[in-house]
C-alpha cells in the first residue's frame, strides 16, 4: 500500500462507521467523529478551487494524483450521496413498514437540514431538523413526514423510530 487516499475506500470506511454508530448501544466513538471525517471528505473534493473527485489523493499534501489524466476525472464511484442520506441525515433502510431515522449530525453543528421528496417504499419522505423552529416553520426539532403528513417528531437530534407508517 502506498498510502494514497482513495475516495471509494473512504466511503466504505465512513459507511462502516455509520453502521457501527447505528448498531452499538455505547459506541467508543461518537457522531462527532463521523461528522468530522465527513467534513474532511467534503473538503478533499476540490481541485484547483473547483469541485472535483478523482481516483486518489496524496496522503501528505492532499493533492489529487493523476488529476490531469482523463481516467481520473471519471472515477467517481464513491457513495457520497448515500453517506449524506443514511449517515448525516440518518435514514436507516429497513425492509419492514417501520421508518427509522438516526442523524449523525452533532446537535451543535447544524441549526437545520432537510431531505425532501425521497421516494422510499413507494412513499414520499421528508426528514427535517429545525433547531429553533424558524427555518421551516413547523416547530422545533426533528420531524419525519410521509406523503406530507407528520409521522414522527423528537425535540432533539437522535434516533427516531416510527412503526407501521409505510
What are these regions (language model features)?
Residues 1-123, 133:
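Non-catalytic carbohydrate-binding regions of carbohydrate-active enzymes
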Residues 118-124, 128-166:
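C-terminal beta-sandwich/jelly-roll accessory domains of carbohydrate-active enzymes
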Amino acid at each position: 500500500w502506498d498510502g494514497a487516499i482513495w475516495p471509494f475506500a473512504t466511503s466504505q470506511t465512513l459507511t462502516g462507521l455509520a453502521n457501527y454508530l447505528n448498531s452499538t448501544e455505547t459506541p467508543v466513538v461518537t457522531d462527532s467523529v463521523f461528522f468530522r471525517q465527513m467534513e474532511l471528505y467534503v473538503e478533499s473534493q476540490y481541485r484547483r478551487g473547483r469541485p472535483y473527485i478523482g481516483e486518489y489523493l496524496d496522503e501528505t499534501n492532499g493533492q489529487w494524483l493523476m488529476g490531469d489524466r482523463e481516467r481520473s476525472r471519471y472515477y467517481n464511484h464513491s457513495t457520497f450521496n448515500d453517506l449524506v442520506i443514511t449517515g448525516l441525515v440518518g435514514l436507516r433502510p429497513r425492509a419492514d413498514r417501520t421508518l427509522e431515522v438516526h442523524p449523525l449530525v452533532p446537535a451543535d453543528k447544524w441549526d437545520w437540514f432537510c431531505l425532501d421528496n425521497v421516494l422510499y417504499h413507494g412513499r414520499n419522505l421528508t426528514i427535517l431538523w429545525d433547531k429553533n423552529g424558524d427555518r421551516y416553520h413547523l416547530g422545533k426539532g426533528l420531524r419525519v413526514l410521509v406523503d406530507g403528513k407528520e409521522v414522527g417528531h423528537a425535540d432533539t437530534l437522535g434516533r427516531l423510530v416510527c412503526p407501521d407508517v409505510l
